Amino acid sequence: RMILKKAIFGVDKNPMAVELAKTALWLHTFTVGAPLSFLDHHLQVGDSLHGERLPTVQSGLQVLGALLLQSEFDRLGRAARNLAQVADLTDVDIAEARLSKELAEAAAADMAPLQAVLDFWRALRWLIPGWPVDKAAKLAKLLPNVDGQPHPWLQGIAQLLNPGVNLVAVLGAGQLPGTGAAVQAANDLMQQARALARGESFFHWWTAFPTVF
């Protein structure tokens, strides 16, 4: 049971496949009198072929001038510590199994804003052919004019990359406060990116399994 919680990792885009994997592992490690081991932290739903590496995205955003606070990236360490505790729990009784679940949920909540950043970056690869760019000025070449005017996403991306915007917090919330065309364009872009990420089940190994990476 301890090897199961520490060393077995898996991901599949089909939720039923993930549940069947859990069932097979539970049957293989069944112990009379003990609850089923908590496995949600290591067996997850997602598309393993479509995800991003956190350091790559972090570097790409910094090149474009985005504000990235180190405190936001400290979330990775906190989540890893919580998940390390989950792996150390034996789930020998209901109380330990519940604690495993609570710690895993706390880790997921910590990682959610970073997950949103990776989802956004991956979605831009789909929405803007040629993304990423190494200079914001190159974006205009990737986005065609609309009715003779610059594409509204140019304003939206510029607004998100503004050094006065905490990008991780904004993407985590999914909404940029304020009014105006640039803010509206940014919110429309984030909405489309989030919908695409949900629909395609993007899976980022770096944030899904922080104890490994």
Please name every model-derived segment.
Residues 1-213:
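SAM-dependent methyltransferase catalytic region
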